[in-house]
C-alpha cells in the first residue's frame, strides 16, 4: 500500500464500531494510521472494523470503554499506549443515539434526562477522552484531537435543542483546549456537521429526508466518507497550522 499522510501514527476513534466512526477509522487506516477502535457495546461490529483495518495492512485493536466514565477513558488511553506506544490522534465520534421524537420535542417538554443525555455522552464524553489522551500528546509535543460539533450549534435551530446545547459546548471546548495545548504542539479542532447519511437517519421518514436534502446549497445529504476525508486532513500535517476551528461540513446548509 502507498505511504499515506498518517504513516506510523496511532489514532483512537471513539464510537469506531459503526456509522461515522467506522468510516473515520477506515479512512485513517487508508492514510497509514494504526487504529484503536473504541466501542461501548458493539464488540462484534468493532472487531469487524479491526479486521478491515488489518486488511488494509495496518495494526488495530478494539478496546471497550464507556466515554461517560472518566476512569474508563483513562484506561482506554493507557491500553492504547501499552499496545502501540503512542497516541497521535483522538477522533471523538461516540455520541448520543439520534431519536426522532426527542429531536422534535418542544424545549419545555424535554425531561431532565433528555436534556442531560447529550451533555453526558457528546460533551462530557468528549472532554473525558481529551483529558485521557492530552497528557501523552503534550509530553510528545504533538497530537490532533478532533471533536464532533454541528451546524445548528452555530446557526441555531428550533428543534434538537438538547443536542444543540451539547454541540455548542463542544465548540467552546475546542477553542479552550486549542489555546491551552497549542503551546505544547497539540491541535484541537471540531467538525460542524450538517445532514449525514448514517444509520440513525433511517428513523427519519422518507418525506422528511427529501425535505432535509433540499436545505443545503448542494441539495443532498453528505456521506460518512466525505466526513472521514476531512478528519484525515485535520489529523495530518496538511493541517499543521489549523487549530481551534469548527470546520463546517454541511453542503452549504449554514448559508441559508
Regions found by a protein language model. Give the residues of each.
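Catalytic Tyr-X3-Lys loop
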Residues: 108-127, 142, 146, 170, ...
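Conserved glycine-rich cofactor-binding loop
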Residues: 10, 17-18
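Alpha-helical segment proximal to the catalytic Tyr-Lys
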Residues: 135, 179-183, 240
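Active-site helix of classical SDR
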Residues: 130, 166, 174
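The beta1-alpha1 cofactor-binding region of Rossmann-like NAD(H)/NADP(H)-dependent oxidoreductases
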Residues: 43, 64-76, 112, 225-226
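Short C-terminal tail/terminal secondary-structure segment
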Residues: 2, 155, 210, 215, ...
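A conserved structural motif in NAD(P)-dependent oxidoreductases
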Residues: 216-227, 238
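Substrate-binding pocket helix/loop in short-chain dehydrogenase/reductase
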Residues: 101-119, 201, 208, 212
Amino acid at each position: 500500500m502507498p505511504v499515506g499522510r498518517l504513516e506510523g501514527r496511532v489514532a483512537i476513534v471513539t464510537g469506531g464500531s459503526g456509522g461515522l466512526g467506522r468510516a473515520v477509522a477506515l479512512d485513517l487506516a487508508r492514510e497509514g494510521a494504526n487504529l484503536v477502535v473504541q466501542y461501548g457495546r458493539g464488540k462484534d461490529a468493532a472487531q469487524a472494523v479491526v479486521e478491515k483495518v488489518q486488511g488494509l495492512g495496518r495494526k488495530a485493536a478494539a478496546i471497550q470503554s464507556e466515554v461517560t466514565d472518566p476512569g474508563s477513558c483513562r484506561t482506554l488511553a493507557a491500553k492504547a499506549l501499552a499496545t502501540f506506544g503512542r497516541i497521535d490522534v483522538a477522533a471523538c465520534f461516540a455520541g448520543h443515539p439520534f431519536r426522532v421524537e426527542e429531536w422534535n420535542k418542544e424545549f419545555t417538554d424535554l425531561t431532565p434526562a433528555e436534556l442531560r443525555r447529550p451533555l453526558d455522552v457528546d460533551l462530557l464524553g468528549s472532554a473525558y477522552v481529551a483529558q485521557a489522551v492530552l497528557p501523552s500528546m503534550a509530553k510528545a509535543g504533538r497530537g490532533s484531537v478532533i471533536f464532533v460539533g454541528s451546524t445548528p450549534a452555530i446557526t441555531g435551530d428550533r428543534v434538537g435543542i438538547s443536542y444543540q446545547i451539547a454541540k455548542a459546548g463542544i465548540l467552546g471546548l475546542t477553542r479552550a483546549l486549542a489555546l491551552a495545548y497549542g503551546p505544547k504542539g497539540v491541535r484541537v479542532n471540531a467538525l460542524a456537521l450538517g445532514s449525514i447519511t448514517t444509520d440513525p437517519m433511517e428513523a427519519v421518514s422518507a418525506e422528511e429526508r427529501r425535505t432535509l436534502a433540499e436545505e443545503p446549497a448542494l441539495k443532498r445529504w453528505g456521506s460518512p466518507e466525505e466526513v472521514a476525508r476531512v478528519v484525515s486532513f485535520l489529523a495530518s500535517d496538511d493541517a499543521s497550522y489549523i487549530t481551534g476551528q469548527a470546520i463546517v461540513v454541511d453542503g452549504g446548509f449554514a448559508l441559508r
